[in-house]
Amino acid sequence: MIALVPAAGSGSRFGAPSPKQYLQLNGKPLMWHTLATVAAVPDVDEVAVVISPQDEWFDDFAWDLPKLSVHRVGGASRAQSVASGLAALACADDDWVLVHDAARCCLSVAAVERLIAALSGHAVGGLLALPVPDTVKRADIDGHVAATVPRNGLWLAQTPQMFRAGLLARALSSAAAEDITDEASAVERLGVKPLLVEGDAQNFKITYPRDLALARAILAARDEY
């Protein structure tokens, strides 16, 4: 099984001088924590990180992680980076691929193992996700409440998202002209249904500077590394 971590983004919303995956978090680059967790999963044979060909930061750090391979084939979008990473890896169609956000650095090994166990023998694949816990409002153009959306059946998608390499490559190719934000969206467009596997609230994506304090606290409380 291959874990693919797209990390070619610039992190423009973060407003930092370097992409957020390289910001220091408890003494190491943020992405180090992500890669270390995925590498610690026994079923994962390779951790392939996809970075931009113009990346100026990756080589500044000593990653010192097992199973790690680096591919400078990242594209302008997440979907392009994942598709290019798959092509660079030359996976067999039946190989399972776990795609995980570089910025979800508080992922646990247990959550990945839960996903793998749930998808053993599954025809399509699936993803970690959380049921929506709060009341959901739809806003109008002026920021007023237009409607309250029933939350029954609504889930918040997380990563990893796990699919067979052949299916994922076809899905990404088919959706190349679309603005998709995760692999499951591309797979759904083929008319198949990924499985939702309950994730973990700690597996959030670092998006804004305020997220770093929570990530520091979570990682400091762990003895994994």
Curated annotation (Swiss-Prot):
| Organism name | Chromobacterium violaceum (strain ATCC 12472 / DSM 30191 / JCM 1249 / CCUG 213 / NBRC 12614 / NCIMB 9131 / NCTC 9757 / MK)
Give the E.C. number(s). Answer: 2.7.7.60
Q: Report the protein's function.
A: Catalyzes the formation of 4-diphosphocytidyl-2-C-methyl-D-erythritol from CTP and 2-C-methyl-D-erythritol 4-phosphate (MEP).
Q: Which PANTHER family match?
A: 2-C-METHYL-D-ERYTHRITOL 4-PHOSPHATE CYTIDYLYLTRANSFERASE, CHLOROPLASTIC
Q: Which family does it belong to?
A: Belongs to the IspD/TarI cytidylyltransferase family. IspD subfamily.
The GO biological-process annotations, alphabetized, read as: isopentenyl diphosphate biosynthetic process, methylerythritol 4-phosphate pathway
Name any one Pfam family assigned in the record: IspD
Location of site Transition state stabilizer?
R13, K20
- GO molecular function terms here? 2-C-methyl-D-erythritol 4-phosphate cytidylyltransferase activity
Give the record's pathway: Isoprenoid biosynthesis; isopentenyl diphosphate biosynthesis via DXP pathway; isopentenyl diphosphate from 1-deoxy-D-xylulose 5-phosphate: step 2/6
Q: Which SUPFAM superfamilies match?
A: Nucleotide-diphospho-sugar transferases (SSF53448)
Q: State the PROSITE patterns in the record.
A: ISPD
Q: Where do transmembrane segments lie in this chain?
A: none
Give UniProt keywords alphabetically: Isoprene biosynthesis, Nucleotidyltransferase, Transferase
Please identify the protein, giving its name as recorded. Answer: 2-C-methyl-D-erythritol 4-phosphate cytidylyltransferase
Q: Where is this site: Positions MEP for the nucleophilic attack?
A: R151, K205
Q: Which reaction does it catalyse?
A: 2-C-methyl-D-erythritol 4-phosphate + CTP + H(+) = 4-CDP-2-C-methyl-D-erythritol + diphosphate
